[in-house]
UniProtKB/Swiss-Prot annotation:
The lineage of its organism: Eukaryota, Viridiplantae, Streptophyta, Embryophyta, Tracheophyta. A motif (DDXXD motif) lies at residues 306-310. This is Terpene synthase 17. The gene is TPS17. PANTHER family: OS04G0344100 PROTEIN-RELATED, TERPENE SYNTHASE 17. Pfam families: Terpene_synth, Terpene_synth_C.
Amino acid sequence: MELCTQTVAADHEVIITRRSGSHHPTLWGDHFLAYADLRGANEGEEKQNEDLKEEVRKMLVMAPSKSLEKLELINTIQCLGLGYHFQSEIDESLSYMYTHYEEYSIGDLHAIALCFRLLRQQGYYVSCDAFKKFTNDQGNFKEELVKDVEGMLSLYEAAQFRVHGEQILDEALNFTIAQLKQILPKLSNSQLAQQITNALKYPIKDGIVRVETRKYISFYQQNQNHNEVLLNFAKLDFNILQTLHKKELSDMTRWWKKMELVNTLPYARDRLVECYFWCLGTYFEPQYSVARKMLTKISFYISIIDDTYDIYGKLDELTLFTQAIERWNIDASEQLPLYMKIIYRDLLDVYDEIEKELANENKSFLVNYSINEMKKVVRGYFQEAKWYYGKKVPTMEQYMKNGISTSAYILLTTTSWLAMGNVATKDAFDWVATEPPIVVASCYIIRLLNDLVSHEEEQKRGNAASAVECYMNEYSVTKEEAHIKIRDIIENYWKDLNEEYFKVDMIIIPRVLLMCIINLTRVAEFIYKDEDAYTFSKNNLKDVISDILVDPII
């Protein structure tokens, strides 16, 4: 779509024909400023929270090591969003289960699948051979398994953690999806039906912790066998964390208003709250409050720069901006048009603020890792702009190679680690800068998920070719065929990601850092599930954000 807009270049006004995104305005405006004076848990809530935590800790410690009770308790604690309180206890229990895995692989379908999933989820590679006992002579899963609904659901969740070459898990996934869909209309247990419906769309492997926690608390409350201590602790903890997150968003909203970018850059998506939601999906724990704010600021600028390259900037302007980013010096802004000067100077200011904040911990040198990744992202955006203006449709190989940069996920991973403390060492930053396979798989997943749901709208306004157009052009297939193939490619990259998760040396790259990579990928799965929910947040994402960041659990 072409639009005549008046823009300022140098020191005089000129009329330039530009594309328009026609994005809807922010849905939230000043809403979160109302929480500026919000206080955390009062003394009574803090005491209640600590008391409940200790009760749950005792339950966890006292549960017999080799029991289904222990497995189900760990699973419930994690699904209720409480796992971060008991990391050492859970780690110890799962380490024990890993060393005694053969003893756990002789139970029923539910027990075996649950143990398998909990271990793989934690980074322990265990064999899937235990599921062979549930297949017949032809290698198909036995039909009588459909009577065990709980076991079927557990097998479905376990199979999501498959890697390449695990045919039995590929079959398990197809089998459970088909059977659970058939079972659903016949279930008299509405709570279980709701849980299965949610799982079929949002399996645990893909789940954003805070989103799934809110839903699981509701499911758990409906379960007649729920534990009142666990339920009360989950509700209280959810609300205490939500209060902290509201306060953080209040701070971010104040920062956003101070930037005044909305009036200066009307073409860009104004999505501060959605950016924060993305970062909250990366890590929600209270100790990462500063890290979340840093990541939100950089995410916000990635979005603005993306829109600048995608729909607004002319090639000569984008050339100047790319060169300025490479120089990374305030003097480089002098050659930029006014709107780009504002973006550039504000971006450098944000990084200066982050550097000063990290200087208190003698970690300011780490900022250069994020800056270097920002340069790579901008180079990727510029390459897409050159393809667009040159009317070139790249090959899939060319597009995907560039997609590592344009996904911005190495930049987000690197930035997410900046304020995580001593766990994020220089060795970890050096590692991620080499573009290891687990990170590349994450980049490819986000790139392709985004393209599947956004390419039609982007083509209407005249964007560069997405993966869909590249695939259609290279292989002479229809849009529908390209979609099917790209979905298969995404599934293979998830297998890559799962496989690499087991290979990474967690002494050098601790699990808490790897989870940022995995959680960023999960957010992408959620945001791009049915639509581009980031761009069109008024459709469905608004209600989810309200559940997570506005409305407490009563």
